[in-house]
Amino acid sequence: MTEKEVVESPQPPFPGETPQSGLQRLKQLFKKGSPETAEMEPPPEPQANGEAVGAGGGPIYYIYEEEEEEEEEEEPPPEPPKLVNDKPHKFKDHFFKKPKFCDVCARMIVLNNKFGLRCKNCKTNIHEHCQSYVEMQRCFGKIPPGFRRAYSSPLYSDQQYAVSAANRNDPVFETLRVGVIMANKERKKGQADKKNPLAAMMEEEPESARPEEGKSQDGNNAEKDKKAEKKTPDDKNKQPGFQQSHYFVALYRFKALEKDDLDFPPGEKITVIDDSNEEWWRGKIGEKVGFFPPNFIIRVRAGERVHRVTRSFVGNREIGQITLKKDQIVVQKGDEAGGYVKVYTGRKVGLFPTDFLEEI
C-alpha cells in the first residue's frame, strides 16, 4: 500500500448523473444481454420521424449493406468450322444459243443476252446470281459415255472413259450401269442366234452358184478365161445389199465400244442384215458385221443421190430453206430448181444451194 492509494468513490459516466441512476443504467444493459429478457421485451416503437428508440432512450440506426451481384460475362460461342468443298463446280461464262433452265431456281436463262454460267465437267447451267447457292455442292464429274450412245460425239475414247469412271463413286449408278451392259449383251446374243431370212438368202446365193459354175466349166479352161475377161471390176465389187431397191448410208460417225459393234464413218454404205430390234440393228460393211443404232443411218431409195455439205449455210425458214453444217450428210429428194435442191437429213427437209453440196 502506498500513500496514493485512496479509496475513491465511482464517478458517474456522465456529468450531472447520480450514482443511483448509473446503477440503474447498468442493470438495464445486463437485462439486454440475457436471452430471456430479450424475448420478453417488446420491440421498440417507431417514432414519428421513422427512427426507432431503444430502451436507453437513444435512437437505433439500422445499416443495410447492399451486395452487388457480379454479372458473369458469357464467353462468345466458338466459330463454326468452315466447310471446304473438295469437288466444286468449274463454272465458266457461257452464251446459251437455245433457251435453258437454271438448275438452281428452275427459271429460264434469258436476261443479259442469254449469258450465264456452265460447269466445265457436269454441264450444269445456272444464272450468275445463283452461283452462291451451289458453292458447297459437289460436282459429280463428266457423264460416262456408255449412256450417250445415241449421239455422234468424240467422247467415245478409252481415256475419257477412264477419267469418268474414276470420278464415279455412286454404288447405285454402278449397279445400273452393269445391268444395262449385261442386258445389251444378252439381247445381242439372242439376235445373233436367230436366223434372218435376208441373211440366209445372201449366204445361199454364192454357195448355189458355185456348183453350177463348176459343172459347166469342168475341162473347159478356155471358156473360163473368156468369162474372166468379160467380168468387169464393177461386177466384182457389187454387194448383195446394194442390188436392192434401196440401201443405207451413215449420217454420223459411230465408234464401236464393244467387240460386236460395227464401226463406220459418215457417208459409208451399210447393208442391213437384221432390223427386228428397234434399238440395235445388225449390219455389214464389206467383211465386217456388227451392231449399230438405227438413228445413225438413213435410207436411200432408187433414183436418190447422197451429198456431203462443203460449207455451212443458215437458211430462211419462211421460204423453205434448211440450215446445215459443214460435212453433214444429206439425201437429195428432187431436181434442181433455181440453184436450190430439196434435201433430207433424216429429221428435216428443205431447200439447200447446190453450190455447197458434193455428191458422194
UniProtKB/Swiss-Prot annotation:
Annotated knockout phenotype: Complete perinatal lethality, due to paralysis and inability to breathe. Embryos have a curved body with abnormal curvature of the vertebral spine and drooping forelimbs. They display multiple skeletal abnormalities involving ribs, sternum and costal cartilage, and strongly reduced formation of bone ridges at major muscle attachment sites. They weigh about 15% less than wild-type at 18.5 dpc. They do not move or respond to touch, but have a beating heart when dissected out of the uterus.
Signal peptide coordinates: none
One of the GO BP terms on file: positive regulation of protein localization to plasma membrane
Role of this protein: Required for normal excitation-contraction coupling in skeletal muscle and for normal muscle contraction in response to membrane depolarization. Required for normal Ca(2+) release from the sarcplasmic reticulum, which ultimately leads to muscle contraction. Probably functions via its effects on muscle calcium channels. Increases CACNA1S channel activity, in addition to its role in enhancing the expression of CACNA1S at the cell membrane. Has a redundant role in promoting the expression of the calcium channel CACNA1S at the cell membrane.
Expression by tissue: Dected in skeletal muscle, including soleus, extensor digitorum longus, tibialis anterior, quadriceps and gastrocnemius. Detected in tongue.
Region Disordered, annotated ranges: 1-86, 187-241
Origin: domain of life: Eukaryota
Zn finger (Phorbol-ester/DAG-type) location: 88-139
Cellular component, GO annotation: cytoplasmic side of plasma membrane; cytosol; nucleoplasm; synapse; T-tubule; voltage-gated calcium channel complex
Pfam families: C1_1 (PF00130), SH3_1 (PF00018), SH3_2 (PF07653), STAC2_u1 (PF16664)
Primary location: cytoplasm
Keyword hit for Metal-binding: yes
Quaternary data: Interacts (via SH3 domains) with the calcium channels CACNA1S and CACNA1C. Component of a calcium channel complex with CACNA1S and CACNB1. Component of a calcium channel complex with CACNA1C and CACNB1.
Domain SH3 span(s) in chain numbering: 243-302, 303-360
Gene: Stac3
SUPFAM superfamilies: Cysteine-rich domain (SSF57889), SH3-domain (SSF50044)
Biased composition range(s): Basic and acidic residues: 207-238
UniProt entry keywords in alphabetical sequence: Cell membrane, Cytoplasm, Membrane, Metal-binding, Repeat, SH3 domain, Zinc, Zinc-finger
GO molecular function, one term: identical protein binding
Topological category with respect to the lipid bilayer: Peripheral membrane protein
Species: Mus musculus (Mouse)
Start-end of Acidic residues biased regions: 64-77
Family annotation (InterPro entries): C1-like_sf, PE/DAG-bd, SH3-like_dom_sf, SH3_domain, STAC1/2/3, Stac3_SH3_1
PROSITE patterns assigned to the protein according to its UniProt record, in alphabetical order: SH3, ZF_DAG_PE_1, ZF_DAG_PE_2
Protein name per the record: SH3 and cysteine-rich domain-containing protein 3
